[in-house]
Amino acid sequence: QFGFPGHVEVVVGQLGDVRRIGASSYNGYRHMNGEELQDILRRGWGVGNHSWTHTIITHETLDLELRQAKDKLEQAIEASVILFCSPGDNTNMAAHVLEACRKFGYLGAMSLTDALNRPEDELFWINRTALHDHYYAPFFSAFDPYRNILYAKKTRGWIIDYCHCPLETPIHPNKDCSADQLQQRFETILSEGGDSVWCAVPEEVLSYHLMRRHSRVETLKHSATQHHYRLNLDKLPHGVPYRSLTFEVQVPAAWCRDPKIWINNQALAATLVRPKTLRFTTDVENGIEIVIGEDRNGPSE
């Protein structure tokens, strides 16, 4: 209805089975299986590892909870898994867990800390905004559809909302919102954010921040008629799935009448977003060359 992609965190040891985790309020519900997870991937959602057992991860269980779980989940969904989501609480964000996440090829880890994420923040401690009917004792704070939105706008932060199973009535009001509350949240994000909202799965956002952090721009030419750049990727981690970037560049006013960009000698349309400012999005690989100018014949040698 709203076009928001979701993200599912999988307890891999119970993939496709009826949930049986301690005294969980969600016991008795069935976990999705591989085919169902593949279906939501085709719908634009994402999938992350929520450990094998949903218990405290010790040094002895790192391989099972992180490596084996990742391998089994990737086989089930026929896609890479780059995100770990801490089960239980931030106990499973301990140093030995995050070190193993890096070792086993994850690109980020999601905590239970209720806070914004900013472009410069550590990607192995991603914060999430809880969408809960109300908080547990002694706080009892009620659901707020505006939670963290205005602060994100002010500080250029990004938000990951999380809930468990938003039905008509929350199964566990300290861990979930209702379906109506989730709809309120979506409506509020769109009304407050307007055209500035980028609705994406975490893998896309992680990829974007990693691409930005590891991109280096080299100026090859900067004349009255042409700007020529080379873009290098410096030590980009292996396995970044999405490799496009959006650029804004200031140019002379005369270049804005019919703006054109050339990426490795291929013409690309650009958009005038403000006076003397062009915007364009392109896939990025190491060493690509970007030319901007008024020459209708393309890049000059």
What positions do the PLM features span?
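Metal-dependent polysaccharide deacetylase catalytic core of the NodB/CE4 family, i.e.
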Residues: 2-97, 103-107, 112-130, 156-169
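C-terminal domain-boundary segment and adjacent tail
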Residues: 74, 104-121, 160-239, 249, ...
